[in-house]
Amino acid sequence: MAASAPTLGPAVIVVALYDIEAADRDFFLDLVRTDIEITRGKPGCLWYSLAEDVVEDNVFRLSEGWATREDLEAHFVSEPFQRTVAAVSTLTLRDRVAYLYNISGAEFTNLPASAE
């Protein structure tokens, strides 16, 4: 599939790391799956995805891209997000770190193909 240049990139990116106890894994995945399905339909959500670390067990990284800071703020106060936050607070987290990046500019690039 050929990549095309995006017409508008995110103004805000959120990246969060969750290191959870193995016993909470399935519940965590169910929570996140539901939250992602709801959030992807919200105004301004450009993407929202989860990736599992392939080396460290039960370590996950969430990333979100938002068109505007206002869209993200509306998400933060929404009932579905608040419900997810409350449910996550019941988990045993070994670590949780989140960063919000304000994007001032971006440049599209096609990554080079392998040199074979």
What are these language model-derived features?
Residues 1-10, 50-56, 86-116:
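Glycine-rich beta-strand-turn "strand-cap" elements at beta-sheet edges
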Residues 2, 36-61:
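Short, glycine- and small/hydrophobic-rich beta-strand elements in well-ordered beta-sheets
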Residues 7, 34-46, 65-99:
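An amphipathic, aromatic/His-enriched active-site/gating alpha helix that lines ligand/cofactor pockets
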Residues 8-46:
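N-terminal first-folded block
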Residues 11-19, 49-76:
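Short, well-ordered beta-strand segments in beta-rich or mixed alpha/beta enzyme
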Residues 22, 32, 52, 64, ...:
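Generic alpha-helical secondary structure signal
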